[in-house]
A protein has these predicted regions:
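Amide-donor transfer/coupling interface in amidating biosynthetic enzymes
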Residues: 68, 101-205
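N-terminal beta1-alpha1 ligand-phosphate binding loop
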Residues: 3-25, 186-188
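Cysteine-nucleophile active-site neighborhood
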Residues: 48-118
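An anion/phosphate-binding loop that grips the pyrophosphate of nucleotide cofactors and donors
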Residues: 39
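Structural alpha-helical scaffold elements that stabilize or flank donor/cofactor-binding regions
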Residues: 35-36, 65, 173
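Extreme N-terminal starter segment of soluble prokaryotic enzymes
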Residues: 1-4, 178
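Structural motif
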Residues: 43-45
């Protein structure tokens, strides 16, 4: 399988590279349009600031390339947010695959810390991306418990395939056509995250 990772100014790219290597896949790290288009699947990680990321992508027309990819794409963390329509972070227009805007967490009490950092559960699972898991509301041992670090979130919408509750319920995962996303870091979520990445690769076969 030819797995490509979008190369740009994002902070968690190499942890995704290492996650794939642990699964026996040597990914191609690239910002070349033709190489992304020819891959069997594309991973679009991100950790950092949305405006700077979009400026980098637009300068290389990678926003258009990503938007028009036909193979399975997995957006991770800021990668999920950049696939949305607009982000409050830097007040920037994003790639626009998902017709929803990214919002900043607004603490409601002293216990609410931003960024949201740590482990949390996934609810309302609705996709093959979560094959083999049961939603946390079912109280199952197989409910996904995954690692998050983020100050901005995607509201619940028609594309939501998993939800998480921190300050309010929000979309921790999205799906539309060939695009899948995780707000959390599967590459930092142990065996649970590895299984989610494996499910994505299986979708890509």
């Amino acid at each position: 399988m030819k797995a490509a990772i979008v190369k740009y100014n994002a902070g968690n790219i190499y942890s995704v590279v290492n996650a794939l290597r642990r699964m026996g896949i040597e990914p191609l790290l690239t910002d070349v349009a033709e190489e992304l288009q020819q891959a069997d699947c594309v991973l679009f990680p991100g950790q950092g600031e949305a405006r700077g990321a979009m400026e980098y992508l637009k300068a290389r027309r990678l926003d258009e390339v990503i938007r028009n990819l036909k193979q399975p794409v997995l957006g991770i963390c800021v990668g999920q947010q950049l696939l949305c329509r607009h982000s409050e972070e830097g007040d920037v227009d994003c790639i626009g695959v998902f017709d929803v805007d990214v919002k900043r967490f607004r603490p409601q009490c002293h216990e609410d810390k931003v960024p949201a950092m740590g482990w949390n559960s996934l609810y309302d699972l609705k996709s093959q991306l979560y094959k083999g898991f049961q939603s946390a509301e079912d109280g199952a041992e197989s409910a996904p418990y995954v690692y998050f670090v983020h100050s901005y979130y995607v509201p619940l919408c028609e594309h939501t395939i998993a939800t998480t509750d921190y300050i309010l319920p929000y979309s921790s995962s999205l799906h539309k056509d060939n695009f899948y996303t995780c707000q959390f870091h599967p590459e930092k979520s142990g065996m649970t995250g590895q299984k989610i990445i494996s499910n994505f690769l299986e979708i890509s076969m």
